[in-house]
Amino acid sequence: MITGRDIYDVLAAIVPLYVAMFLAYGSVRWWGIFTPDQCSGINRFVAVFAVPLLSFHFISTNDPYSMNYRFLAADSLQKLVILAALAVWHNLLSRYRRNGGAAASLDWTITLFSLSTLPNTLVMGIPLLRAMYGDFSGSLMVQIVVLQSVIWYTLMLFLFEYRGAKALISEQFPPDVGASIASFRVDSDVVSLNGREALQADAEVGRDGRVHVVIRRSASASTTGGGGGAARSGVSRAYGASNAMTPRASNLTGVEIYSLQTSREPTPRASSFNQADFYAMFSGSKMASQMASPMAQHGGAGGRAQGLDEQVTNKFASGKAADPPSYPAPNPGMMPAPRKKELGGSNSNSNKELHMFVWSSSASPVSEANLRNAVNHAASTDFASAPPPAAVPVGGATPKGVSGSVTPAAKNGGGELEIEDGLKSPAAGLAAKFPVSGSPYVAPRKKGGGADVPGLAEAAHPMPPTSVMTRLILIMVWRKLIRNPNTYSSLIGLVWSLVSFRWNIQMPSIIKGSISILSDAGLGMAMFSLGLFMALQPKIISCGKTVATFAMAVRFLTGPAVIAATSIAIGLRGVLLHVAIVQAALPQGIVPFVFAKEYNCHPQILSTAVIFGMLIALPITILYYVLLGI
């Protein structure tokens, strides 16, 4: 039976934490003691030193050889059951969406998993459960913290990076290319696919038709080359988040190349380029020169506001070598359009050429600048004497999935360049595969002018093989983990506890005192940092009352209900069952909110769950405590 003294002991353990939180809130919102920059410094100290050392203190002093594995199994089973249910729900609704129904989102799967399974065990759970059920429950909470740090937060990172990888592939690759990606290589300075930094994907298509992608940060680059018929570098100047998008000749003879490079940041304005400003033609000795020729956007102001600017190769049969003219280049409108017989005739060397394709989304801040400045030079004349490669069949047929022959023709009324399939090859579907306007995230337009159901393009966008995606995600998760101080504190604390409790080794007093002086302040500083965060938010409930109510129901009802079922299934009874249910009803954890904010995945919902949940958590947990004790 719960007595008044028991309730007072719980309040005595928890109220000081709320005092620290409200002092921080008042220091910013009412008294103006701290500026936002100062708050950022305090939060940085808490994230780098206070909380990691607090985690180390609890984990290193917990005996891993006396862990309650049934309790941990019940907690883990709760998370797995909820994750499996959300996965089934997401797959069913995703299938329904592809049939034209309501949209389902991976974002909601991640958010609901965070809300229902990841409470604030470290800061709130340990002192609260100790006050309710004794010191043994505090030890159980430490065991939960270990699993959260090592397994569940890592799983969250995996899901977020998977989400980022899907978005990157959907945004930067046409649908028919995504499934052909055979490998990813990520530059060492790319830490995450969270979309906060501008990235570009540079892809090459091999003889087998598989795409090999290099992901790197966008960076402004301006390189020029010289020297007669030698291969020259293109020139590209980025706009906004600068990004080099220069089409480059491959060092593999007969290999067709896609250079797909776009930023993941939105463009500040629509493109307003003039195709005549950046048209250039270079000829090589006894070969048909390749040029990156942009296809103009849809005519009129409305067409220019569409989403995709494409540059497609133009092939021109030429005679003797001529020195490439200097920029600015001739106006394409004044140039005669090559005839089909010139491209496919017996005297044409077009089958020995290197085909280039640059796909640039105007959703990128660099697309306009690239369309204004991209210049492509012909490759060395060594390619002219090479035999026709297997990847480019004799007769002019272009393999499926790579660029076709596109030539500038007479302008239509809107100022567009007509696409001419001079070889009548399977590449006739190029315009459909790489639409002139729109992006993989935008549903295709109907003939009547209306758009199809939103989200269809994203839903139907094929992904690379599972092994390729898994390797990419593991690389990004590893890079995130090795930059997180909590990773080191949790692992080092776990290793030390295994050693110290196995051989009864005590930590040197100097090291122990150095850690304690900061870890003792960790609990209060964590709550103080949470109060600063609350004060800096414009509203406590930032996601709307309906969504906030739903989030609170998931947090305080769904989680405890599921863990009650899994605990009973595992065989927990009595006080252990009560501890499992109450810890599932703790307020929302802070780490899931940090992830949601970083990856821009429903941050308003998680913010409300942290702030508002902290305010109502104390009466709710006490209510659970009283009801379970009856």
UniProtKB/Swiss-Prot annotation:
Biased segments, Pro residues type: 325-335
Annotated positions binding (indol-3-yl)acetate: V51, N120, L122, Y153, I590, V591
InterPro entries per record: Auxin_eff_plant (IPR014024), Auxin_Efflux_Carrier (IPR051107), Mem_transp_PIN-like (IPR004776)
Region listing for Disordered, in residue ranges: 317-350
One family name in Pfam for this protein: Mem_trans
Role of this protein: Acts as a component of the auxin efflux carrier. Involved in the basipetal polar auxin transport which contributes to the spreading growth of the tillers.
Subunit structure: Homodimer.
Protein name: Auxin efflux carrier component 2
Source organism phylogeny: Eukaryota, Viridiplantae, Streptophyta, Embryophyta, Tracheophyta
